[in-house]
């Protein structure tokens, strides 16, 4: 049973024919023309890209430089504040040492005041006892006088 070869079907032993070289070149040329702009446009686009990239990088570097300058100024101000705080702490320390010296020089007088206070309390206690004794004596005297 042999198959019939028809106008639609190629014979079984024949392979399909590839397009000719002239057909292939026409297709490639069309693709290249559609994708690739003229060389003058490419050069202009490259210059434009490089100038914009240069502007961008210059801006980035300027921003970074300004950030570092800001940090430097902040560090200087912080350093000045710490110097002021150091001076204030030094003044407080000196004043505290002076107060401690004055307190040490007043210490004997404070001890004398404490001793005098104790003596006054003792004398006051003795005066109350003497007052109580004198009242008892007076009461005895009045009692004896009534007899």
UniProtKB/Swiss-Prot annotation:
Question: Coiled-coil intervals in this record?
Answer: 84-132
Which residues are listed as membrane-spanning?
none
GO biological process: any one? anterograde axonal transport
Disulphide bond pairs: none
Compartments where located: Cytoplasm, Cytoskeleton, Microtubule organizing center, Centrosome; Lysosome membrane
- Report any Pfam family annotated for this entry: BLOC1_2
Matches recorded under InterPro entries? BLOC1_su2
Per the record, which residues fall in region Disordered?
Answer: 1-41
Where the protein is mainly located, per its record?
cytoplasm
Q: Which residue windows does the record flag with biased composition (Acidic residues)? A: 26-41
List cellular component terms (GO): axon cytoplasm; BORC complex; centrosome; lysosomal membrane
Q: Which UniProt keywords apply?
A: Coiled coil, Cytoplasm, Cytoskeleton, Lysosome, Membrane
Record note on quaternary structure:
Component of the biogenesis of lysosome-related organelles complex 1 (BLOC-1).
What task does this protein carry out?
Component of the BLOC-1 complex, a complex that is required for normal biogenesis of lysosome-related organelles (LRO), such as platelet dense granules and melanosomes. May also play a role in intracellular vesicle trafficking. As part of a BORC-like complex may play a role in lysosomes movement and localization at the cell periphery. Associated with the cytosolic face of lysosomes, this complex may couple lysosomes to microtubule plus-end-directed kinesin motor.
Q: Which family does it belong to?
A: Belongs to the BLOC1S2 family.
* PANTHER family listed in its UniProt record: BIOGENESIS OF LYSOSOME-RELATED ORGANELLES COMPLEX 1 SUBUNIT 2
Quote the protein name from its UniProt record.
Biogenesis of lysosome-related organelles complex 1 subunit 2
Q: Which organism is it from?
A: Xenopus tropicalis (Western clawed frog)
Which lineage ranks, top first, belong to the organism behind this chain?
Answer: Eukaryota, Metazoa, Chordata, Craniata, Vertebrata
Q: Which gene encodes it?
A: bloc1s2
């Amino acid at each position: 049973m042999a198959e019939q070869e028809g106008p639609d079907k190629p014979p079984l032993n024949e392979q399909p024919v590839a397009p000719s070289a002239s057909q292939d070149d026409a297709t490639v040329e069309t693709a290249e023309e559609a994708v690739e702009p003229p060389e003058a446009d490419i050069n202009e686009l490259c210059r434009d890209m490089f100038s914009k990239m240069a502007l961008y990088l210059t801006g980035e570097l300027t921003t970074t430089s300004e950030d570092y300058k800001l940090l430097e100024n902040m560090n200087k101000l912080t350093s000045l504040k710490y110097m002021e705080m150091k001076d204030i702490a030094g003044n407080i320390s000196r004043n505290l040492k002076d107060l401690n010296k004055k307190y040490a020089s007043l210490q004997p007088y404070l001890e004398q005041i404490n001793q005098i206070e104790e003596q006054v309390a003792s004398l006051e206690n003795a005066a109350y006892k003497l007052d109580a004794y004198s009242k008892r004596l007076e009461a005895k005297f009045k009692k004896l006088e009534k007899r």
